[in-house]
A protein has these predicted regions:
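Extracellular, repeat-based ectodomains that mediate carbohydrate processing or recognition
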Residues: 16-429
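Boundary at the C-terminal end of the N-terminal hydrophobic targeting segment
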Residues: 11-15
Length: 429
């Protein structure tokens, strides 16, 4: 069980990020700006790529030289059901420089293609990966292993009754293979909503909440697993091997959180220099009506929890579909300082005018956070996603930003296309 400590938060000035405009994008809901895009932006050592839906719901790809303000943009031959905010686009580069794209998924057949040549924005034909268990796909995510191979995560099945599937791609043979058809099982009664992170050592961390039904109010608990061999075998935070698939009964729990706690699903996690995991989320305590951002992490004494505690506005999570929520699900980045790891938490909150905001600390354990804004104007219902590979290489936080609107459920707002922007910010400056 995690030890609990409230954090203190103060305002702080922040160096302005550098902003570039890519092009106009669909803004009638939050499909371009949901937190679970892995990735919205991705780069190799000299070129960065971006993906989004335009106003006609076409999948658009763009690229630029790192450091440049000029983007080359290409509208692909593919469209997606952008009216459903679940149907986000995910990108990743493999070790050979080929761009992989998955898009338009919410309990429907796999939609996947890759660039015709390394460095190209043109996509080849839509294709299968392994050709099995690809008929009901949601939440596609790519992760690049240190050797250039890729992992592809997705949920098979629906909310409240889905399983976590993992495929692996080999650039040398240009083929996908199945690693796990059912890494985390809901046993037909629930499903795991996960977040994952590949650390600098190549360890793959996964944490998740369970959901008992399609109603978000049934989210509960926070569980954890890790893999030291590229996703093949899995263990607890203490190194105890898991017998697969992992179930509600066999999972290691970082924190027990009851249903009806406004616990959100699909957030983010990171790891420090020693490979210790850090999970960002939000929920409310019993006896409080205000959900607060939290960081749950593992140290030598066990699982710990820090409550940032700076919010004042109440809200409640319940029902189905994409919710219009006054705060964004957070992204967390953790420094590689061995003794006193610091962190950056990126979020949006109506209390702060729905801007791109950050909370920073130089020492997660002491609970002192500084909060500031990276933008002056509102970004509507935006949630943070970023270039994981650029952050890993250089410590530059490159954020996908767009002012979008989300109507509760799967409604659409009557708004014009809004600029897709990239904000580059170095937290140390």
């Amino acid at each position: 069980m995690a030890a609990i400590l409230a954090a203190s938060v103060v305002a702080n000035a922040t160096a302005a990020p550098v902003e570039t405009v890519v092009g106009p994008g669909w803004a009638n809901n939050s499909v371009n700006a949901v937190v679970f895009r892995k990735n919205s932006l991705v780069s190799d050592r000299d070129t960065q790529y971006v993906g989004y839906y335009d106003a006609e719901r076409y999948l658009v790809l763009g690229k630029r030289k790192l450091g440049s303000t000029h983007w080359t943009v290409h509208r692909t031959q593919y469209q997606g059901n952008a009216a459903d905010a679940h149907n986000a686009i995910s990108l990743m580069l493999d070790g050979a420089g080929t761009l992989h794209v998955a898009w338009d998924h919410h309990n429907n057949a796999l939609r996947y293609a890759r660039s015709v040549t390394p460095g190209a924005l043109e996509l080849g034909p839509q294709q299968a990966m392994v050709g099995k268990d690809e008929e009901s796909v949601s939440y596609p995510e790519f992760y690049r292993l240190p050797d250039g191979r890729l992992l592809f995560f997705y949920r098979l099945g629906g909310s409240g009754r889905g399983d976590l599937v993992i495929n692996r791609y080999d650039p040398a043979s240009a083929t996908w293979t199945r690693l796990h058809t059912n890494l985390i099982t809901g046993e037909g009664k629930r499903n795991a909503y996960w977040q994952a992170f590949l650390d600098h050592r190549g360890t793959l961390h996964v944490s998740w909440v369970w959901r008992e039904s399609p109603d978000v109010a049934s989210n509960h608990d926070l569980a954890y697993a890790r893999s030291r061999d590229g996703g093949v075998t899995w263990e607890t935070s203490t190194g105890k091997p898991y017998v697969l698939p992992i179930s509600a009964a066999s999972a290691e729990y970082a924190l027990r959180i009851p249903q009806n706690s406004e616990l959100i699903n699909q957030t983010s996690m990171a790891a420090d220099a020693d490979g210790r995991p850090y999970i960002a989320s939000y929920w409310r305590d019993a006896g409080s009506s205000v959900p607060q951002y939290r960081v749950v992490y593992r140290d030598a004494q066990g699982w710990q929890m820090r409550n940032l505690g700076f919010r004042h506005t109440t809200f409640s999570l319940s029902g189905q579909g994409t919710k219009r929520i006054p705060i964004a699900r957070p992204q967390i980045m953790v420094s590689l300082e061995a003794e006193r790891p610091g962190a950056v938490l990126v979020f949006r909150d109506e209390e702060r005018g729905s801007k791109v905001s950050v909370a920073r600390t130089s020492n997660i354990a002491d609970g002192k956070w500084q909060v500031s804004d990276l933008t002056k104007a509102s970004v509507g219902s935006w949630e943070p996603s970023f270039d994981t590979e650029l952050w890993r290489r250089s410590g530059v936080l490159s954020l996908f930003v767009q002012d979008v609107r989300q109507v509760d459920g799967e409604g659409q707002a009557a708004v014009a296309a809004q600029p897709v922007r990239v904000l580059d910010w170095h937290p140390e400056q």
